[in-house]
Amino acid sequence: QQLLDTQFVEAADDIAMHYAVDQDQDVLAAAEQLMGDSWFGRHAYYMAQRHSAANNPTYLYFYERRPASNDETIGASHALELNPLFGGFIPFWPTDARDDELSEQMQLYWRNFAATGDPNGAGLPTWTAFDELNAQELALGHERSYSRPVVRADRYEAMTNQLLRREQALQPVSSD
């Protein structure tokens, strides 16, 4: 609650509705999701909205592949996707065939986008472009990769609305 009150001030209760906690053990998971969404997810979503509104080819992804380690606790953390994207993995963490497949897919998507402005290509699951009317993301997950509606869009929207209200409050008042 302190994190919500500090970061979201007047919108804390509205944001909290998206991170409901039923049991004590859910508190850590909700806090981890809140931090990830507020520090990274909402900003990527906002930038995708602005980028696509300017008619630029826009593709958003959500990395879900957790390390295959018995010791991990926070799931797919920030920047963890950089390992498969660049074809390397964290030493001493177990990997499997899906890690290799995901690494190859990600490299192909990025290479295709750099060459053509479209990440899609032969043999790859379709990555649907993001636009404001059809907010899609590519889920890079455990079993497979697939396009879907942005799963946390309602959370990102609530956070973005709060940020925009703050921004408007800082705008100078016109002397007209």
Spell out what each predicted region is.
Residues 69-73, 135, 148-150:
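Short, solvent-exposed polar/charged micro-motifs at secondary-structure junctions
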Residues 99-122:
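Non-catalytic, well-ordered alpha-helical segments in soluble enzyme domains
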Residues 143-176:
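Tryptophan-rich aromatic "cage" segments
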Residues 120-148:
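Mature extracytoplasmic/periplasmic domains
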Residues 58, 106-111, 166-175:
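Short secondary-structure transition/capping segments
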Residues 55-62, 116-126:
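Acidic/polar loop patches that form or flank catalytic/metal-binding clefts of enzymes
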Residues 1-100, 109:
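Substrate-gating cap/lid region and adjacent catalytic-acid/histidine neighborhood
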